Amino acid sequence: ILRCLVGSEMCIRDSAEIAHIEVRRRDLRWPIPDDLEQHLAGHRIMRLWRRAKYILIELSNGAIWMIHLGMSGRMIVEPSGHNEPSKRTAPHVHVVAETTRGDVVLYQDARRFGSMDWISNDQLESHPRMANLGIEPLSEALAGPWLIKRLAGKVAPMKAALLDQRLIAGLGNIYVCEALNRARISPFREAGSLKPAEAKRLAAEIRATLQEAIDAGGSSLRDYVRTDGELGYFQHAWRVYGREGEACSCGKKGVIERAAQSGRSTFYCPACQR
């Protein structure tokens, strides 16, 4: 989503000014604040980036627009000169923003599990949803020695530890399943049992899995689409997720199994993941 917003022809262009913002429903996971519009409209877009699973858009007045897509949220960008019919009248479009250049940004969320807020840029790190986030999974900080140190003594299952946003911010269920399979590590073993070579391999596979997913435009299940409305393609490269009963690619005649962990589906190969 973020790369589409900042890097492609379907983008919100840097320095574009938000001319108007319409909030149609405020009752998302957390209510959209009543003063969101006054802090966004009339100000230029200066910077776009991501922290964990949040999209952050900094404006010229020092406000940061914080967006979380939740389970089913979509950001749809209709650039100026867009020739297709607008989706602004589509069901579940809760927020419509327009720039002075004619770009239109829609927030669509059928389940309303997402969130939208604003905060002053000097208060971002202390915001309740930001203050306790861990390191970024694509950062150089994620390395074998760091994992060994942070997981030492933890008896929680490996998968549960990796999904803890206080440890690594932004990892989700699909990508943890995939990275653990690539690293040949069981999702059920104690997190503190990692050996140095395993930790090095796991850190590398987390980054590789995420980068491949980004390059493929993400994974499309029921709800996810890119900002241009197209599907992502990484689901075609999944090695274990959603492949229960299929042969694992490990070559050890393993068959992919599914188990429930903390209310989520875990897919793994018992033959190669130890």
Locate the predicted segments by residue.
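Glycine-centered tight beta-turn/hairpin loop motif at sheet-sheet or coil-to-beta transitions
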Residues: 60-62, 100-102, 251
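Short, conserved beta-strand segments within well-ordered enzyme catalytic domains
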Residues: 20-22, 47-49, 55-58, 64-70, ...
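Phosphate/anion-contacting hairpin/loop surfaces
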Residues: 65-170, 175-182, 190
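Active-site-flanking structural segment that lines cofactor/substrate pockets
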Residues: 32-50, 57
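Basic, nucleic-acid-binding surfaces and adjacent catalytic neighborhoods in DNA/RNA-processing proteins
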Residues: 19-35, 49, 146-274
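A short catalytic or substrate-binding loop motif that flags glycine-/basic-rich loops and adjacent residues
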Residues: 47-51, 87-90, 240
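Single conserved hydrophobic/aromatic residue that forms the stacking wall/gate
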Residues: 1-7, 12
